[in-house]
């Protein structure tokens, strides 16, 4: 698949950072310690899949201040029994801007399948700028406001906080089914989300 230069640069950046951060994961050596997801070295991969479902690890208690609504807390537990797509982003991040339309399309195409998207906005210490990003890009799903990246620590041991954007697909038990350490297109993400959404709910 051919990518514009921005997408190539983003993927290359993810590869370099992921290779140097000891906390990334691969589909071959993902580990679940006590049922908890742990990132391990990605070996240069930017698309990581975890099968069978019984081998998947769960993320922690993802929760934080809602980006768009003052005084509201948004949590992963708000979406019990749903497939959840977590996207870590910042308005300052070029690849995040590049993938915004694609993420929104996948969200619209899959939400009737019991799929929810949840953003985690990081390193934006001016909240208004992050809110403008949501409005200008017509993002229809919520985001947690996490300028200090504290929420990221709940995503798994050794989470690679340097890799932005990152997208994590959680199954209906909120275990990690896939991780993307790169900017995404519809054709990258939608087939994976649909496959996970179609898994038997008692699988694993």
Task: Please report, for each region that a protein language model flagged, where it lies by residue.
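N-terminal targeting signals for export/organelle localization
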Residues: 1-65, 199, 203-204
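Short loop/turn microsegments at loop-to-beta-strand junctions
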Residues: 60, 84, 164-165
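Short, acidic, Ser/Thr-enriched surface-loop or helix-capping motifs
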Residues: 66-68, 170-171
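Short active-site neighborhood of thiol/selenol oxidoreductases, capturing the structured segment around
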Residues: 74-97, 103, 117
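Active-site-proximal beta-strand/loop segments in catalytic clefts of secreted hydrolases
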Residues: 88-90, 120-123, 146-147, 182-183
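Structural microenvironment flanking redox-active thiols in thiol-disulfide oxidoreductases
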Residues: 97-137, 148-154
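Thiol/disulfide oxidoreductase modules built on the thioredoxin-like
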Residues: 132-140, 146-201
């Amino acid at each position: 698949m051919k990518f514009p230069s921005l997408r190539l640069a983003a993927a290359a950046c993810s590869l370099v950072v992921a290779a140097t951060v000891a906390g990334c994961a691969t589909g071959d050596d993902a580990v679940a310690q006590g049922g908890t997801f742990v990132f391990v070295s990605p070996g240069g991969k930017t698309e990581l899949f975890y099968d069978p479902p019984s081998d998947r690890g769960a993320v922690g208690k993802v929760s934080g201040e809602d980006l768009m609504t003052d005084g509201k807390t948004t949590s992963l537990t708000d979406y019990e029994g749903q497939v959840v797509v977590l996207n870590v982003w910042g308005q300052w991040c070029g690849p995040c801007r590049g993938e915004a339309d694609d993420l929104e399309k996948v969200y619209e195409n899959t939400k009737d399948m019991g799929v929810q998207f949840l953003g985690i906005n990081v390193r934006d210490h001016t909240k208004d700028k992050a809110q403008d990003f949501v409005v200008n890009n017509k993002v229809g799903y919520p985001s947690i406001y996490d300028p200090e990246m504290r929420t990221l620590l709940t995503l798994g041991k050794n989470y690679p906080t340097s890799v932005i954007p990152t997208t994590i697909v959680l199954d209906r038990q909120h275990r990690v089914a896939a991780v993307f350490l790169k900017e995404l297109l519809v054709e990258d993400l939608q087939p994976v989300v649909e496959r996970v959404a179609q898994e038997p709910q008692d699988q694993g």
